[in-house]
A protein has these predicted regions:
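Basic/aromatic-rich interaction segments and small domains that mediate binding to polyanionic partners
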Residues: 1-75
Length: 75
């Protein structure tokens, strides 16, 4: 879980927490993430007026977004 996304930089690699997204993603995207959960941060998205989503690029080149609680930093 990312606690403060303001410290992240575009191009930074993050890990998708598969257990956090299992219920909301289509099966084809879930399979991609299960094989390779590391994604690249490409931007931010306002999602509900007071929360930001993190826009990421998957290993197959697709763009998707996740909440901070669904990602973690790779140290």
């Amino acid at each position: 879980m990312i606690r403060d996304s303001s410290t992240l930089q575009k191009g930074q690699n993050l890990r998708v927490e598969v257990n956090e997204v299992r219920d909301r993603l289509p099966q084809n995207i879930l399979e991609i993430i299960k094989k390779e959960p590391v994604v690249e941060l490409v931007g931010y998205k306002m999602v509900d007026g007071n929360q930001f989503g993190l826009v990421v690029k998957l290993t197959n080149g697709d763009i998707n977004w996740f909440f901070e609680k669904e990602l973690s930093e790779i140290m």
